[in-house]
């Protein structure tokens, strides 16, 4: 079974995410045994950010890494697991709010494809970049 990075690389919807993870030097971490739960924004999600945001972040690697690790949780959590929780702590350190009352919401994003199994965890595809704070 492919790992989280291999799944992202093989799916054209995640080209911006792959570029960002590579720029932030997080590829090795996300290829490690983990396990990890990744909330993966699509290219469409990144395109919703204000113009120039991605370029600015790629030039500020510590901030980019902080935002990306806010999308990662240590451990493997399925949709069913997450829906039993109200928050989950990100690798970045901040909590992420979970709401399953109307669909599957993760802070300001909706999970559009849950539970993509990877060798070292699980991916939930989201429609927005999760905003910190």
Swiss-Prot record:
Identify the PROSITE patterns for this entry. FAS1 (PS50213)
- InterPro entries xrefs: Adhesion/Biosynth-related (IPR050904), FAS1_dom_sf (IPR036378), FAS1_domain (IPR000782)
Q: Identify the residues that the record assigns to the FAS1 domain, covering every copy.
A: 1-130
A single Pfam family it belongs to is Fasciclin
Q: Which SMART domains match?
A: FAS1
Origin species: Synechocystis sp. (strain ATCC 27184 / PCC 6803 / Kazusa)
Its name, as the record gives it, is: Uncharacterized protein sll1735
